[in-house]
UniProtKB/Swiss-Prot annotation:
Belongs to the methylglyoxal synthase family. SMART domains: MGS. The active site is at D71 (proton donor/acceptor). GO terms for cellular component: cytosol. This is Methylglyoxal synthase.
């Protein structure tokens, strides 16, 4: 696979996702980081996004609820280069009916090389990083070259 670069702007497009048993933890994290997060563009799965917007007043672009396709919508935005970072407080102790969607979401975040936080500690590390406030170049798959090679 060949790679190219993509610029992540200083103003990030951040996806926020949380399983039911982790929503309160994500809401607390958002509240603790409200002054930073409100400077960025937020996206979320349906229930999570609405809860964040109600609790914090920060505008959130909400997708469908995760089990109804919201995880896949966020994944599509990642593949389109429209999401720069994923904060996903997932619940490792409880299975969810849309587990394949969760795996696909994490796979896409990895394929497209965006930062991912899966708990409060990693989310704190990301938001406190000097890179969070800066424009950053990341390596991403060169899809056009990939497609050309596949069509030969």
């Amino acid at each position: 696979m060949e790679f190219t670069t993509r610029t992540i702007a200083a103003r990030k497009h951040i996806a926020l996702v949380a399983h039911d048993h982790r929503k309160q933890a994500l809401l607390a994290w958002v509240e603790d980081n409200k002054s930073v997060l409100e400077q960025h563009q937020l996206y979320a799965t349906g229930t999570t996004g609405n809860l964040i917007q109600q609790a914090s007043g920060i505008p959130v672009n909400s997708m469908l609820s995760g089990p109804m396709g919201g995880d896949q919508q966020v994944g599509a935005l990642i593949a389109e280069g429209k999401i720069d970072m994923l904060i996903f407080f997932w619940d490792p102790l409880n299975a969810v009916p849309h587990d394949p969607d969760v795996k696909a979401l994490l796979r896409l975040a990895t394929v497209w090389n965006i930062p991912v936080a899966t708990n409060r500690s990693t989310a704190d590390f990301l938001i406190d990083s000097s890179l969070f406030k800066s424009e950053v170049e990341i390596a991403i798959p060169d899809y056009q070259r990939y497609l050309q090679d596949r069509l030969k």
